[in-house]
Amino acid sequence: MHLMYFTEQPMSAYPEDAVGEDGTTALLFSNEHFDSVAGSRLYNERLIEYRLAEEVGFDGIMLNEHHDAPFCMQAQITVWASVLAAATERIKIVLLGTPLPTLDNPLQAAESLAMVDMISKGRLVAGIVRGSGTEQYANNVNPAFNRERFYEAHDLLVKAWTEPGPWRWEGPNYEFRVVNPWATPLQKPHPRIWVPGVASPETIVWCAQQRYPYVCLNTTIEMTKQIWELYEKSANEAGYESGPEHRGYLLRVHVQDTEEKAIANAREYMWMQGEFTGLGHPVWSSPTGYGSPANREPTLKRINQRADAPQAMPFEEQLEHLQIVAGTPDQVVERLRVLLEETRPGILALWGNDGKVSHEDSKRCIELMGSDVLPALREIGDELDLRDPFEVGAPLSTQFMEAPRIPEGAPA
């Protein structure tokens, strides 16, 4: 089982009384409230924590990207990826992911990701995403073309990595007279591609058709099972049998020496949930054209005041339903066993620290995960035969039916 560490890198150093009446801080909360000293401290503390995650035995560090909001300080995912490529030695650098449809020039992503893969000596997982509705506004992109731009940018990215140039690209959204990137990834034919999401049926089906792992982002156990059912059905229709190596799961998990302290820190996830989801503006989160009509219906009802806005599940209920797992190492392992037995992912990302959890508590959480939780999870993974794509040598994709390889003579 592939075990990753994740944090949104949220920034809480702003005057909360400056937030508008609707409570949202995404997109239109003025950056006059940004504190660059606090921002510098945050980045450097996160780097210490990432290095610690490698030291204690995590297999990967998961990174993501958001814009114009304090809930996520990762505005450029490839910047952090390049930092980790140089600052770490062993751990996989897992991007979940590069928001392809927001890019007017996907070839720049192809080049920068290739550089990260070479600097890291082949440790990149080049995950891709559509980007949330809010990201379309932040990047000045028409949301109506998001999905088709996602598919086309993906095809262009893969071709740029694998087909020698120069050649011309003429598509409905992108046109390039010359495609001939000199730098291509170290991994051949290209790095693995994983796709995260929150249950969009179209994306799940597409992932299964491509043989890409789909990583569920903190979905409920029941929703996760429904996702796997759709993935498995789509995989069967594509002519193969899916397994744990195609299933990923991101879950909020916080560990401390005492249950009392773990629960107190885990309550900070609710601050994060308010920043990100509970107070997300419905118009910005789901702009016209971004989602399918069926997926957009609940949002339209809220906008037109024909339905109440969804409220975050109370903290205690999230603990009960394993949406949040917090406690001592033994308590956390016991609860994660239930989740692993129910959902059977080969890829598990532990969303360890967020909100206003201190740097020292974050480090202690990572240390306890490494000493007690990760070894127990590996034993459970072996017991349940939860193999990840690297362990089974899973095919890269439907297009490339082999595992990525690092050429002979590459630096060790």
PLM ranges: what are they?
Residues 3-7, 61-63, 93-96, 124-128, ...:
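Hydrophobic faces of well-ordered beta-strands that scaffold small-molecule active sites
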Residues 54-55, 81-90, 113, 117-124, ...:
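Acidic (Asp/Glu)-rich catalytic clusters
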Residues 3, 53, 57, 65, ...:
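Conserved, mostly hydrophobic/aromatic
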Residues 199-223, 227-228, 232:
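A conserved active-site cap/scaffold subdomain adjacent to cofactor or substrate pockets
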Residues 60-80, 100, 137, 219, ...:
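Glycine-rich, proline-tolerant flexible connector loops at the mouths of alpha/beta enzymes
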Residues 4-34, 147-182, 223-345, 374, ...:
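An alpha-helical appendage that flanks or caps ligand/catalytic pockets
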Residues 28-44, 97-107, 189-199, 253-256, ...:
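Active-site mouth loops of central-metabolism enzymes
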Residues 1-91, 189-191, 388-392, 403-412:
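N-terminal beta1-alpha1-beta2 module of alpha/beta enzyme domains
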